[in-house]
């Protein structure tokens, strides 16, 4: 636990970078076409690589303030996509053009899908940013 408290931003950056690379591997190497909601989740995750990387490099204690909105938006989108994969009738018109957002290309152990991986990544980043915020408030 002390490692997490000491390196929370570095761990969050590693998660964001891994998620970015994995999404690129899925789409470019494995040729899995991303749906609209996957693109929106990428738009939330990719800036986190830069924000957390720069914040870590500059030792900016406010980095959680900058990164938190991106992580929350990505988490909400991933929850919505998990929901429409479980209940396809609840799909909005946003996914009506191109690849269906209810399509489940990856299904490990019967429940781990690409949006579930995204959800776990965003949730872990939010928890690590919260740890940073607590640490920041204690130092005041």
Swiss-Prot record:
Gene3D superfamilies tied to this protein: DsbB-like
Coiled coil segments of this chain: none
Pfam families given in the database record: DsbB (PF02600)
Localization (cell): Cell membrane
Membrane topology according to the record: Multi-pass membrane protein
Superkingdom of origin organism: Bacteria
GO CC, any one term: plasma membrane
Record field: transmembrane: 6-25, 40-59, 66-83, 110-134
GO molecular function terms listed in the Swiss-Prot or TrEMBL record: protein-disulfide reductase activity
Gene Ontology terms describing biological process: protein folding
Role, per record: Required for disulfide bond formation in some proteins.
Family: Belongs to the DsbB family. BdbC subfamily.
Listed PANTHER family: DISULFIDE FORMATION PROTEIN-RELATED, SPBETA PROPHAGE-DERIVED DISULFIDE BOND FORMATION PROTEIN B
Name recorded for this polypeptide: Probable disulfide formation protein C 2
